[in-house]
């Protein structure tokens, strides 16, 4: 049974901002196409910033850098164009039985890239997502799309995991949800404390995972993770 399907709108006018769409049409909500005049203004702002920082924009390799930079930003934040409500949900064989449950569904590692909303610098890593289905499931590939939909925005690591867990809870109403993320943050590697190889880990537990330590251990073991090195949120 298809669920969470909304009418999609697109705008074909203006500048095509993405060469390769990262999300299929079934997850598209809108396109952030803008006019050529608006794009030109963004280029001018980017050029002003680069010039102030000392970049020579008159060389053959840098004269198109402002344009490439703006396009790269739209590509890196394409998650704003997607909508998790457009993911198709299927029924399981559990019909009204509160104790009917499936085995754990675990997907990972799921590589992701995001932009920190504090400094607009990248952070990147991988995610593991698991849930114990009740009456609804989604295709395992959709877990990957869900992570990347929320990651390809200006965000923070904690929010990405929270949004994935919240969305699965609303869509599937499963017995439990587990989300683990680990990432390198360039805002700590390139600036500030300038630590070369810190790895930030966050975990999110819902339902049965939150109340059952053995389920958490089973999830972490299946993912090849150390249970004593994660920070729960």
Walk through the language-model features, giving the residues of each.
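A domain-level signal for the structural core that forms small-molecule/cofactor-binding pockets
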Residues: 1-233
